[in-house]
Amino acid sequence: MFARACENIFTLVPPMSTPYRTAPIETKGIPAGIPYIVGNEAAERFSFYGMKTILVVFMTQYLLSAQGQPNYMTDTQAREWMHLFVASAYFFPVIGAIIADAFLGKYVTILALSMVYCAGHLCLALIDLPSAALSATLDPKGWMVAGLVLIAIGSGGIKPCVSAHVGDQFGHANKHLIEKIFGWFYFAINFGSFFSTLLTPWLLKNYGAGWAFGVPGILMALATFVFWMGRNKFTHIQPRGLRYFGETFGFSGLKSIFKLVPLYLFVAMFWSLYDQGGSAWVEQAQQMNLHFMGIVWLESQVQAINPLLILIYIPLFAYVIYPLASKVIKLTPLRKILIGFALTVVSFAIAAYAQGLIEKEEARFDETILPMMLRGDVDVSATCKAMRAEEKNSCAVQLEAAFALPTDNSGDNIKNAAMAKSIIRAGVAVLKDGTTQRANWPTVGWQLLAYVVITAAEVLVSITCLEFSYTQAPKQMKSLIMSFYLLSVSLGNLFTAAVNRFTMDASGNSTLIGANYYWFFTKVMIGATVLFIFVVVLYKPRQYLQDDPDAASAH
């Protein structure tokens, strides 16, 4: 009796008299709840990637104390913080999955944690409070930490539930649509990501951190509302209650987990490299000529090419590349992932080569590069033979015994510099022994090329893993298995954070510098790709769907 009472308490299933459906409808078409999930995902991903896009730039160029004084992090410190945050966001899926599958169900879990998510965005928006309010509450770094913790809990907790919720809407009659719907689900992710990646860097530069972090929060509130609107259209798979733990951690459940975990360890290496698009690649873009194709890019805006390419690649791969390739070779999910790994190696090799070009140009001038993206007065005690500065207009500037940038260039000024002449043109100013020279900094086009390759890898790895993880999970473990896949993102980012931590010197900078940093990760990915060939050969797949009989999931 006691066990039955506990089960009734913890199950929290909507009463059967409610309008909620508890099994997929037999239809060959798209389930009615899918548009609400896809719309929710587009707005939620706008909020997450909009915030994530500017995080490194905020920490290294905009983070202040409560009194308004600079409290910037070094590039290495910012990379570590960034990857620890992403690792946390992809750790909480395990907790969210257990809550959803055992106690609350996916719908209630998503709705509740979405509110936590919104609270996190609010904390980030409060970074721009007046100094008196910051001194009385938390300083900007404190609000940042509070916001990132809440966002990690909220976004992480809902991740496995949302993707598993997509699969729950399908039965055997329309299972042929699952692959395409997961593709369009991923399309929605990148639709939101594309616009936020363009917008939030502009908001940060022109309106400050409050607006840059606040607008994504508004979109998260919209995402929550859209999801709530679809409540009567969804299939609500009932939570299992205390039975869940016996089913999950019994022989058949553990067998499914241990079968998939080795695969996810390899996928973790992909995410280690991929997620550096928001950290190391942003820092690399700061060292490049950002004039490309008639556009002056902001360093954190270059990432926008990734979701734009995803929007192009998803239909291209689904309707052109996969059908053509299937005439030559059987494209199993694991083979797609293997090809994606190989492309990831190529993309990081391109980034490493571009970094080598940057180092070659720096060595040509034997220079100290002074950061030009600082706020307030900057006292510099240094002698440099070369200097780079970002240009915001098209005219050349020539000054005697002083160097100044116009106020529309973030208000930066350098005064009393001991130099003969300076020229600012095409984003570069270089002086050497009193003479003016033109530097040939590598174009940001190199990084865009790397994005073209790694985005193709993302389509092959990430979308495939979403579909593969859902279909390979026993039906009572859909959210949990999806969370283990997402945990691979966490492990990959922990690996990146650990590399930055263990190579950090006393001043907070990495000893693994320049192209060596990129070549290190390239070699790690080569090793993972070679070893993954054995997984492709040995793994034996099996599908599970929600309208399978219960006995099928016990095998």
Predicted regions and their residues:
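Hydrophobic core of transmembrane alpha-helices in multi-pass small-molecule transporters
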Residues: 135-158, 365-366, 441-460
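C-terminal ends and interior cores of transmembrane alpha-helices
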Residues: 115-138, 343-360
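Intracellular juxtamembrane helix-capping segments at the cytosolic ends
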Residues: 157-172, 460-473
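A gly/Pro-rich, aromatic-decorated transmembrane alpha-helix motif that marks the paired
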Residues: 53, 94-98, 126, 191-206, ...
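Central cavity-lining transmembrane alpha-helices of secondary-active solute carriers
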Residues: 83-100, 304-317
